Amino acid sequence: MTRPDSGSSPAPLSEARRRKRNPLPTVLGITALLGLAGFIAFGNLNKSLEYFVTPTEYQQQAAQLKGRPVRIGGLVKAVKYNPQSLELSFTVTDGGASFPVRYRGAVSDLFKENQGVVVRGEFEGQTFQARELIVKHSEQYDVPKTQAELRDLLEQSE
């Protein structure tokens, strides 16, 4: 059975109605994800920082830095080194405060009294237990030009 042709085409179907979405859940979701990423990236950053301080600064901030890894810089005094056991003990000072330091490991030939040093580690009681020892030195190196200068350099290194 066919329909009689009425001579006109059927009316076009109305466009599908678009559903209007509320942007609030999307904005809240993105904000939550950014907040979580920021917390993961920076939340524990303060705990992992290692501060560089002088002995006097450490003495003033001891309560805040207690139990945290720090780097202490100063001058070396009273060196005792056992090359067989690689045990090194010395005092680091900035002229105001001093701390005893213990370190186990190989020591640079540049390490000596009155030399600048940076030690990295933590305090155990009143003694600083260093895990890393960095000796400061001059950036300039002049090759001895005469035999006398070479002799003087060798004598100073002993």
UniProtKB/Swiss-Prot annotation:
The chain crosses the membrane at residues 24-44. Keywords: Cell membrane, Cytochrome c-type biogenesis, Heme, Iron, Membrane, Metal-binding, Signal-anchor, Transmembrane, Transmembrane helix. The keyword Transmembrane helix applies. It is found in: Cell membrane. Heme binds at H137, Y141. InterPro entries: CcmE, CcmE-like_sf, NA-bd_OB-fold. It is a single-pass type II membrane protein. Residues 45-158 are extracellular. Residues 1-23 are cytoplasmic. GO terms for biological process: cytochrome complex assembly. One of its GO terms (cellular component) is plasma membrane. GO terms for molecular function: heme binding; metal ion binding. Residues 1-20 are annotated as: Disordered. Gene3D superfamilies: Nucleic acid-binding proteins. It holds the Pfam family CcmE. Residues 1-11 have a biased composition (Polar residues). Belongs to the CcmE/CycJ family. Heme chaperone required for the biogenesis of c-type cytochromes. Transiently binds heme delivered by CcmC and transfers the heme to apo-cytochromes in a process facilitated by CcmF and CcmH. NCBIfam families: PRK13254.1-1. This is Cytochrome c-type biogenesis protein CcmE. It comes from Deinococcus deserti (strain DSM 17065 / CIP 109153 / LMG 22923 / VCD115). The gene is ccmE.
